[in-house]
């Protein structure tokens, strides 16, 4: 049986994205980060809404239209409407951060 916490490489030069399921407009991804962040001045501007939860580790998101960043720890989730510009400011370097992202 597949497991979200299996097959996580010890070293990750960049984020690891794995599509777990895709049907019509819905896509479910596992994202693994380990001390990663978005490049300077880069903003995600996605055509699809995204719902994301942190399953392991911790992260900080920044939304272009918000004055303060959003810190996420295990169990925290956020809905990101389509075209709401955001970036990953930080993921913990202490352990892999495992996200589950659902694009709607």
Range-by-range predicted roles:
Residues 73, 82-104:
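Ligand-binding loop in jelly-roll beta-barrel domains
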């Amino acid at each position: 049986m597949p497991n979200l916490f299996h097959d996580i490489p010890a070293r990750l030069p960049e984020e690891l994205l794995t599509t777990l399921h895709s049907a019509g407009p819905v896509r479910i991804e596992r994202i693994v980060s380990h001390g990663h962040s978005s490049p300077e001045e880069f903003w995600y501007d996605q055509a699809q809404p995204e719902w994301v939860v942190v399953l392991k580790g911790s992260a900080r998101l920044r939304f272009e239209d918000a004055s303060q960043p959003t810190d996420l720890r295990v169990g925290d989730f956020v809905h990101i409407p389509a075209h709401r510009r955001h970036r990953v400011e930080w993921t913990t370097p202490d352990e892999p951060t495992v996200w589950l992202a659902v694009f709607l």
